[in-house]
Amino acid sequence: MSSATEAHVRTLSNGQEIPLLALGMWQVPDGPTAENAVRWALELGYRHIDTAQVYGNETSVGRALAQSGVPRDQLFVTTKFNPSRKDPAAELARNLQRLGLEYVDLYLIHWPQRGPTWAWPGMEHALELGYTRSIGLSNFSVNELDQLLTLSSVPPMVNQVQFSPLAYRRALLEASQARGIVVEAYSPLGTGRNQFASNPAHCRI
């Protein structure tokens, strides 16, 4: 990574560094739109690309990464387990095929469907197999975090949640920090539905 990129990272509990800024691929159509989004982001200096099985664009993301010329060790790739499926490790193996990668840097449970704990052993297994460098969660509450932590051999490194000035979840942030879990925000500037851009204070910032 460049010195500018290295200055904008957080260190996870396992020592891995995660770039603070990522390109999120939610609602980006598969095909040329997704490929161009990734390509242009990498040209602008982004090194963290965040996708998911349910986004349906992993193949295009992988194609753009392969064509970018950016060395793999300078990229940080996140994907997510769809908890309507059964086996996190097997699903990640399929994700890797679509992405054209040997591993991802971060693998998250996309949401706590069917309870917060059942999928975690499979996430730990994916880590043991070398399919991912780090594992974590998305959209988990404090109570769900604590249920999982009582049963986990490897604690989650990340909890990715909606977090913005209009959705400032202080209790979740403080509880996660106390447990050594990095909170990663999606929609950090809000979404079109919450009229973030119409707030004068936000516009001044």
Which positions does each model-derived feature cover?
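N-terminal binding-site loop/beta-alpha segment at the start of enzyme catalytic domains
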Residues: 1-75, 89, 189-192
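A short, structured active-site edge motif that brings together acidic residues
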Residues: 72-85, 105-112, 139-142
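Generic structural signal for well-ordered alpha-helices
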Residues: 7, 38, 58, 62-65, ...
